């Protein structure tokens, strides 16, 4: 079993990286539960975390707040650890519409999803790696706190094959069917097997190119080979191979029988309650749907939406904690939370959103109450898995600050780059002033980011700049992740000189060519101009030796003051370090990478379908109040998660609603 991490890099830790690595390693050795790496933009936080992983040598889970960011981290860690198991675990849905019911219009929305096969393979590769070795790093999105099958069942049902092992061919076939492999002699793909005389070929769920060929002599395995599934080329002989289940929700036959009995019992109880409350239509609907699922489970061993019965399949009591990816890790694993100021609130919010939707389904007879136990972890359940956790952020949130007694600061950049200088200029004449600044940057072949407060202002500014001949593009929330990465690439290549947007805090905007970040209406206190957002936005100009930030404002707000002072403090620290070590700041020379494959596989931005404002005139006063409250709550949550376009859209809708009401 391979169990050492090997870090491969031509760089050595520099600046204050060695100090940060030493402090974090010491903290873990001393058994500190919570630590925070407060790392300024561009200080090489991923490299620091890689060194930490190598030193403490524990299986590690890195949680990012969306698939794109997870994809970027996956490619970086893969470069640092080419000889270890770096895995990727995100939601495998390219498109996902959860089942839901709208009582007002009596509309049931069926679950509709398309599963990305590449990501499903990567998920299986991640869970199987955890059972085979200790040198595992899994980069995951928040989907790692969603329910999976039992790790004990998963481990127990692994089919282990060795050369000279005595097993009948038909018994092997039965075992493969039990772990949800399908026999398919024609279309040979992931999760299937085919039989040709005394040869059984198995295509593991965690692979996409290589299959396993098992050759029998009578009732004995004569030879096990790894074969290229497409060309048939033999890649090597194996003494032993472990075939992991093709689904994370595998259940033994005797357990399945018990689960079916429990589901039937729950169904009878729920039908009784519904009849007593006069819910006859709901009772009929529930019985019809559940009986159909039970029939499928008896005949096929699974049914559509089997995860809704996961509590029964794992024989857990009501309300108990579901199994998740975290349970597949050994007890001494380490968690790294990237961009923790966004990720932690996201983990916290998952449970409530899921329960609200499922409760409606249960109340109206679409699901049994046990479906509520197929859920993401509550935050306090997630906390129970925190043995060693490191939060990584340039602007740690309240949770991290409260739980960490001492921040590990990483302010010095290996390149000697300083935090940008900040100018505050009056709002009057801001556009003309901005155009002058843009022209100066274009002459020096540098790029500009401009952040505005509203969608309308972004659009108007973009149109105006285009009219006067400036190469500009507008980054808005409807742009898909991959398209967004391409626009950023085009900015770097010089197809555009200026990018305008509301939320310039999304991942992938660390662009060395950007020497100016302009913040319009910086004194309009609110979620778009909070101290945390401002510090993050200022960081966008910290990759260039000429980096500068201009805030257009008529007064200096509290948030502006905090952000300006923090930037000044960091800059002074960086200048001191450069003087002591004779370092001259150099703009980062970062290759313009093509979009990585894991990101392509994960291409999926959280899609928000902003509904048209509901007609308040048709609602009662109570309903009206409820809609407004819900939208205000959503707006605040979106702002907390730094998803400002969504928050701004909701804010505009709220104003519309209030005007109507």
UniProtKB/Swiss-Prot annotation:
Pinpoint the UVR domain residues. Answer: 625-660
* Residues binding ATP, per UniProt: 39-46
Please verify whether the record's keywords include Repeat.
no
Does the record's keyword annotation contain Transmembrane? no
Record keywords: ATP-binding, Cytoplasm, DNA damage, DNA excision, DNA repair, Excision nuclease, Nucleotide-binding, SOS response
Q: Which domain of life is it from?
A: Bacteria
Subcellular localization is given as: Cytoplasm
Q: Residue ranges of the Helicase C-terminal domain?
A: 430-596
Question: Which biological processes are named by the entry's GO terms?
Answer: nucleotide-excision repair, DNA damage recognition; SOS response
- GO (cellular component) term, any one: cytoplasm
Q: Where is this motif: Beta-hairpin?
A: 92-115
Matching InterPro entries, A to Z?
A: Helicase/UvrB_N, Helicase_ATP-bd, Helicase_C-like, P-loop_NTPase, UVR_dom, UVR_dom_sf, UvrB, UvrB_inter
Q: Name one GO molecular function term.
A: ATP hydrolysis activity
Question: Quaternary structure?
Answer: Forms a heterotetramer with UvrA during the search for lesions. Interacts with UvrC in an incision complex.
Described function: The UvrABC repair system catalyzes the recognition and processing of DNA lesions. A damage recognition complex composed of 2 UvrA and 2 UvrB subunits scans DNA for abnormalities. Upon binding of the UvrA(2)B(2) complex to a putative damaged site, the DNA wraps around one UvrB monomer. DNA wrap is dependent on ATP binding by UvrB and probably causes local melting of the DNA helix, facilitating insertion of UvrB beta-hairpin between the DNA strands. Then UvrB probes one DNA strand for the presence of a lesion.
UniProt note: domains: The beta-hairpin motif is involved in DNA binding.
Query: Family, per the entry?
Result: Belongs to the UvrB family.
Please name the PANTHER family in this protein's record: UVRABC SYSTEM PROTEIN B
This one is known as UvrABC system protein B
Q: What is the protein's species of origin?
A: Bacillus subtilis (strain 168)
* Lineage, highest ranks first: Bacteria, Bacillati, Bacillota, Bacilli, Bacillales
In the UniProt record, the gene name given for this protein reads uvrB
